[in-house]
Amino acid sequence: MDNLGETFLSLEDGLDSSDTAGLLASWDWKSRARPLELVQESPTQSLSPAPSLESYSEVALPCGHSGASTGGSDGYGSHEAAGLVELDYSMLAFQPPYLHTAGGLKGQKGSKVKMSVQRRRKASEREKLRMRTLADALHTLRNYLPPVYSQRGQPLTKIQTLKYTIKYIGELTDLLNSSGREPRPQSV
């Protein structure tokens, strides 16, 4: 770090000694124990119409500094003249409420996962019951179909059972209608 400082000092062609000392002090980040604040220096330092980065320097202020800032005890305030914000870095040390307990976040997520598993089980049970009821109804339909519609030695599939049932009902309807009236046209 000393070599860097010496190298930096040798490059100070256009800077006066007060600028160099302030610039080097800003590099010493390890020695700062207090929060930092940006403060605009006098406008004579910058010739550009808009403020530039060179016209700001870091100044260490105690937390809750009320000198030029307006703001409450929340650690935030604004400078009226420069329009800058003071930030209380002690606010960064807080932990969110869900991290205060050792397994806080994990516990919340665990209960959510448990709810999800429980809901899936209930949905699975409802689906099983629905499929069982449907299978019973199809089995009853197969029992009412005449043996002509059944395949030899193999049970009918669900779709075959429904198609043959519709066809059988159509034939029965035709039989009833033909006893005194004309036959009903077959639909495909």
UniProtKB/Swiss-Prot annotation:
CDD domains: bHLH_TS_Msgn1. Residues 118-172 form the bHLH domain. One of its GO terms (cellular component) is nucleoplasm. InterPro entries: bHLH_dom, HLH_DNA-bd_sf, Mesogenin/MesP. It comes from the Eukaryota. GO terms for biological process: cell differentiation; segment specification; somitogenesis. One of its GO terms (molecular function) is chromatin binding. It is found in: Nucleus. Gene3D superfamilies: Helix-loop-helix DNA-binding domain (4.10.280.10). Involved in specifying the paraxial, but not dorsal, mesoderm. May regulate the expression of T-box transcription factors required for mesoderm formation and differentiation. This is Mesogenin-1. It comes from Mus musculus (Mouse). The gene is Msgn1.
